[in-house]
Amino acid sequence: KLIFTTGVIPALSSAVRKLTTPAENVLIQTPVYNNFFNSIRNNGRNVVENELLYDGKEYRIDWEKLEQQLADPQTTLMILCNPQNPAGNIWDRETLARIGALCKQYDVIVVSDEIHCDLTKPGTEYIPFASVDDTCRDISVTCIAPTKTFNLAGLQTAAVYAENSILHHRMWRQLNTDEVAEPNAFAIQATIAAFQYGEEWLDELREYVEKNKQYVTEFLQEKIPLIHPVAGDATYLMWLDCRKITESGRQFAKFIRKTSGLYVSGGNQYGKGGEGFLRVNVATSKLVVEDGMQRLYESVDAWLKEEKISK
């Protein structure tokens, strides 16, 4: 039931083209990976943002709003991010089943981007959307890849899974039409090698990334308490709540880059709910993370001094 392709984003764009028609709505849950917007808008479809509710500690789904948006006859596709990027949520079985039931009720197909599925916190369970129940299996297309986990993005390799024979055929046709259905021979062999022989390395990586996250959390608590890291159980990314400092993550990210040379992503690009947040990648050596946190500290200090002067 797997269809090989050159990347998750090309597959998402193909799904939007094949499973919807122009001017229809595609629902996403923001803040979410910014390329989702491109895959939707570049193909002449409308973005519907189901903003996740944030209580200062964690994110949850606004179920009432979600049902209203799915009930709109113009909404025909939902792109689910599982695990969620940038917040790091791993949606539990009950949540996924509820999403599946609502989408089935309102005839909405689910495309589940599960590219971060192998990058979970050690000891934490990840649940594929299609595995939850028959409903989730029959109404969904799942996108997976080794590219985040094993740093193989440059090889352009991914796969699409669809148990439903009709969805499987439609995706196969569109991926071939778009000429993104055949990864190169080297990518195929690298993918096989990664999954066959990379388990021990991956376990060590997950432990290492988790320690980096713990370091960042402790550093912020001690040195920059105005920034609050959102607790996430997946991805090698950290989602930082900077709203006690600024409401514009975009401007803050630019300032940090200018003053310290540290590259972080402003939260505004991830849609509603991303304002005042930063996304930080900690999939690197401890020394680089330590240096990055020191640069962040210096930039925050400079920002606060400028704010004080301007007032």
List each language-model region with its residue ranges:
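Conserved PLP-anchoring active-site segment centered on the Schiff-base-forming lysine
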Residues: 18-40
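Active-site phosphate-binding strand-loop segment of PLP-dependent enzymes
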Residues: 54-124
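PLP-dependent enzyme catalytic core of the Aspartate aminotransferase-like
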Residues: 67-68, 136, 255-264, 270-311
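Conserved glycine-rich beta-strand-loop-beta hairpin in the small C-terminal domain of fold type I
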Residues: 185, 192, 208-217, 229-242
